[in-house]
Amino acid sequence: MSQSARKILVTNALPYANGPIHIGHMLGYIQADIWVRFQKLRGNECHFVCADDAHGTPIMLKAQQLGITPEQMIGDMQRSHESDFSDFLVGFDHYYSTHSDENRELAETIYTRLDKAGHIKTKVIEQLYDPQKEMFLPDRFVKGECPDCGAEDQYGDNCDVCGATYAPTDLKNPKSVVSGAEPELRESEHYFFDLPAFGDMLKSWTRSGSLQNEMANKLNEWFEQGLQRWDISRDAPYFGFKIPGTENKYFYVWLDAPIGYMSSFKNYCSTTGKADWDTYWQADSEAELYHFIGKDIIYFHSLFWPAMLKGADFRQPTNVWAHGFITVNGTKMSKSKGTFIKARTYLEHLDPEYLRYYFAAKLTSRIDDLDLNLTDFAQRVNSDLVGKVINIASRCAGFIQKKFDGRLSSNVADSALLEDFQLAGDNIAELYEKREFSRAMRDIMALADRANQYIADKEPWQLIKQEGSEQEVHEICSLGINLFRVLMVYLAPVVPKLTEEVQSFLNDNFTWDSHKTALTDHPIDKFKALMQRVEMDDVNAMIDASKEEQASQTPAVEANDELKKEPIADEISFDDFAKVDLRVARIANAEHVEGADKLLKLTLDLGGETRQVFAGIKSAYDPEALKGQLTVMVANLAPRKMRFGLSEGMVLAAGPGKDEIYILNPHDGAKPGMRIM
């Protein structure tokens, strides 16, 4: 490279150590891995680290349920995660755990520095307490009736039915999820990080180019509402690190989790000697630091994390890059539909490079959700990788092997065409750098089309029949192999295993600059099939296996189980029922609600007027999949003002929640506005 090598540290969001990796998780890890492989191919000094997020109440309780220690559980889970990442060709330079000596030391260092600088405050708060388990209950470990709409079996932070948010202490008739006991209200002293003290610094940093514009704009809401002090402590019993100077207080998992980036890299530096930790983390560091994360953890990484680092006199990230979620066939990943696919289940049926390429073909630098349409997935991989790229080598290699002793020609048949392919490298490199992988794949496949068209026009299989045509055929097919080689250099960050096989076939080793050269008078090996086509039978077998996994994990349902869980309500008169005006409505539009975890905003067409309704169905439906559907709404429900806007009715749905919510659909013959009697 003409410029000096950059020093780069890349991290991925830490997977939580209480469950397996699924293909939704893999999106972010594949995105980061492609970017890292590109940087290394360019000759940059790029280090790629990650770790398991191994602390918190959920891990403590799950280990108790399994009858093992938390240490044993997180150890088993780490091995499982590392195996999945390795088999998906995610090439971490180091993978560690937040339950480590390095992480404890760094967490204590950061806390102590913040405390000495006056950024740690204490406050007595009221919390729900389980008297049987003798533990304070986090919001997701208490359930009760929603204080707004009265819906039963709702968690302690928000309602799945009406979308209301509240404190656990606001629940009616609360019960501990851990023991079923009625919790008590008790006081406890907690430790808080003074986030408001960093308001000016964060406003400047979030607009410095370190975040995507969508992220920076979203964070304005927090600044407008006013930053609040952040509770960084949890009461014993808790699986984590004890706060220095306390007897029964522990660091909240989200305090020591991002410090895991630092501790994983610290262990990597000390065990391998391949990098100097201070060079990448001290306040005056000139190295580049990038975090790849999901959009659901933006706040922790773009507010709390940079403020903690600033207050403890460490450097801030160069960029925090968020990605969206995945849907499968247009809807949320669903266990019942078999589209909640574990990474290991995928690997047992399909080549990981299929998914790596498909994700790359759809990923952009924006925070957009990505749909894994399984039919399109098979068609695109078969068309692009097998039908276009590999087909070039398949069409040319046989002639080289059989007619020319496996040696490429000394001359280039069409230097202008080869130069066009080579000149495309700068633009493709820029697209990789900017994480515009989708555009890069389109450009590469456009080149592949040109290469195939060149071979089709030259028809070497016909030309070879003509006497004296051997040299021309040799040069045509040799150019085809060189065009294929350039394409594989460009694809190397996406399909590393295929690239290794191609390098072996070509007797070559790639760097990014390999695209600027050609192989002439060069031996190649006999061509072997480099990739099999995606078979829909294998895709369907994967879906069936996912369904079977879900069935094996779900207890058998007794007859009338739904009625047992929620008995039929008290009898009402016909006059009472007649007061409820149920109408057929067409979903004219559906969209996400900024800041809402459960809600979608629906625009409902009643055949003469439109209504805006907020529905707690986000966990089960992709907005695009809802548009145009008929549904049923309560049309005369009094409008309800929510913090996201006015909700002018309610749509009807059934199901226990999460991905199992089913909106009611009238027969296609029904028309918007019709009353249901």
Curated annotation (Swiss-Prot):
UniProt cross-references to Gene3D superfamilies, sorted A to Z: HUPs, Isoleucyl-tRNA Synthetase, Domain 1, Methionyl-tRNA synthetase, Zn-domain, Nucleic acid-binding proteins
Cellular component terms (Gene Ontology): cytosol
Cofactors required: Zn(2+)
Residues involved in Zn(2+) binding: C146, C149, C159, C162
GO molecular function, one term: methionine-tRNA ligase activity
Compartment(s) of residence: Cytoplasm
Keywords: Aminoacyl-tRNA synthetase, ATP-binding, Cytoplasm, Ligase, Metal-binding, Nucleotide-binding, Protein biosynthesis, RNA-binding, tRNA-binding, Zinc
GO biological process, one term: methionyl-tRNA aminoacylation
SUPFAM superfamilies with a match to the protein in the record: Anticodon-binding domain of a subclass of class I aminoacyl-tRNA synthetases (SSF47323), Methionyl-tRNA synthetase (MetRS), Zn-domain (SSF57770), Nucleic acid-binding proteins (SSF50249), Nucleotidylyl transferase (SSF52374)
Motif ('KMSKS' region): 332-336
Span of the annotated motif 'HIGH' region: 15-25
Domain tRNA-binding: 576-677
Major localization listed first in the record, in broad terms: cytoplasm
Cofactor binding annotation: Binds 1 zinc ion per subunit.
InterPro entries in the record: aa-tRNA-synth_I_CS (IPR001412), Anticodon_Met (IPR041872), Met-tRNA-synth_bsu_C (IPR004495), Met-tRNA_ligase_1 (IPR023458), Met-tRNA_synth (IPR014758), Methionyl/Leucyl_tRNA_Synth (IPR015413), MetRS_core (IPR033911), MetRS_Zn (IPR029038)
Positions of ATP binding: K335
Reaction catalyzed: tRNA(Met) + L-methionine + ATP = L-methionyl-tRNA(Met) + AMP + diphosphate
Coiled-coil ranges from the UniProt annotation: none
Function: Is required not only for elongation of protein synthesis but also for the initiation of all mRNA translation through initiator tRNA(fMet) aminoacylation.
Protein family per UniProt: Belongs to the class-I aminoacyl-tRNA synthetase family. MetG type 1 subfamily.
Oligomeric and partner information: Homodimer.
Protein name, as recorded: Methionine--tRNA ligase
Organism in which the protein naturally occurs: Idiomarina loihiensis (strain ATCC BAA-735 / DSM 15497 / L2-TR)
Gene of this entry: metG
